[in-house]
């Protein structure tokens, strides 16, 4: 699937190593390979954006290596492709040897997979399913400040799905563990690949059922009900959390204005 990049090759360039992304001038490189000193590198086409190929090159650059978070303001489709590249680069880097027999592996020519040359085991990129949920109580939404976000941003609750658990069960468990309340009338909204490092966010809306807020201090700094027209600092646009909050606000406006 990969090939050597030639002088006239062009497109978007995802140059990644150890979950970092090359961002010269703070931007995702776009243009001819020669302009970025990429001729002769091995590259894998991982998609297209607006008719232009998106290439993945697994390489460490001396300067301008940053986080994929820095390009979160890109168009959603291009951000997702950049995230795909970072995740694939880390997958190939971390699967050089078979976890069963220890022998060297090689990339498949037909799909994103690594194959063992000895025991024939096949490995695919790992995806960690997560739930994220906006909880409404009359004209208010439950928002929390997470311990990992000490920048004042308040957001909705989220967490990883556990082994042997449905998405619906994960919502109920995470909400109870983090906030101490029960929810009802769960409704699926959308999903979003989230490369931090390899999550797939499944987004829901729910209604408050019962209970008082009792936070898990290992997860949350604080949580509270906020009226739809008096909200704290929110996650940036383009995130699924922001969409859930805005959808909830729209529902409240329609009902209370």
UniProtKB/Swiss-Prot annotation:
Span of the annotated motif Nudix box: 159-180
Binding-site residues, a divalent metal cation 3: 174, 178, 219
GO biological process: NAD catabolic process; NADH metabolic process; NADP catabolic process
Keywords annotated in UniProt: Hydrolase, Magnesium, Manganese, Metal-binding, NAD, Zinc
Bilayer-crossing regions: none
Protein name (database record): NAD-capped RNA hydrolase NudC
Similarity remark: Belongs to the Nudix hydrolase family. NudC subfamily.
Broadest EC class assigned to this enzyme: hydrolase
Quaternary state and interactors: Homodimer.
Cofactor: Mg(2+); Mn(2+); Zn(2+)
Reaction equation(s) it catalyzes: a 5'-end NAD(+)-phospho-ribonucleoside in mRNA + H2O = a 5'-end phospho-adenosine-phospho-ribonucleoside in mRNA + beta-nicotinamide D-ribonucleotide + 2 H(+); NAD(+) + H2O = beta-nicotinamide D-ribonucleotide + AMP + 2 H(+); NADH + H2O = reduced beta-nicotinamide D-ribonucleotide + AMP + 2 H(+)
Pfam families: NUDIX, Zn_ribbon_NUD
Binding residue positions for Zn(2+): 98, 101, 116, 119
Binding locations of a divalent metal cation 2: 174
Positions of the Nudix hydrolase domain: 125-248
GO cellular component, one term: cytosol
NCBIfam families listed in its UniProt record: PRK00241.1 (NF001299)
EC number, as in UniProt: 3.6.1.-, 3.6.1.22
């Amino acid at each position: 699937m990969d090939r050597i990049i030639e002088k006239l090759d062009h497109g978007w360039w995802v140059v990644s190593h150890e979950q970092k992304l090359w961002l010269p001038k703070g931007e995702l490189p776009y243009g001819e390979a020669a302009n970025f000193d990429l001729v002769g590198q091995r590259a894998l086409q991982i998609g297209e954006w607006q008719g232009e190929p998106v290439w993945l090159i697994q390489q460490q650059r001396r300067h301008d290596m940053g986080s994929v978070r820095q390009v979160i303001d890109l168009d959603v489709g291009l951000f997702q492709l950049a995230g795909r590249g970072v995740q694939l680069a880390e997958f190939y880097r971390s699967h050089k040897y078979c976890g069963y027999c220890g022998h060297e592996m090689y990339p498949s020519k037909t799909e994103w997979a690594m194959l063992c040359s000895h025991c024939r085991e096949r490995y695919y990129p790992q995806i960690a399913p997560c739930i994220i949920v906006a909880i409404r109580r009359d004209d208010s939404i439950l928002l929390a400040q997470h311990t990992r976000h000490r920048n004042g941003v308040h957001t909705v609750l989220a967490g990883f799905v556990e082994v042997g658990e449905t998405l619906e069960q994960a919502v109920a468990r995470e909400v109870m563990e983090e906030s101490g309340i029960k929810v009802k009338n769960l409704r699926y909204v959308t999903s979003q690949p989230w490369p931090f490092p390899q999550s797939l966010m499944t987004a829901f809306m729910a209604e408050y059922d019962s209970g008082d807020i009792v936070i898990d201090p290992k997860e949350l700094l604080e949580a509270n009900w906020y009226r739809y027209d008096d909200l704290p600092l929110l996650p940036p646009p383009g995130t699924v959390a922001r969409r859930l909050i805005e959808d909830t606000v729209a529902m409240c406006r329609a009902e209370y204005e």
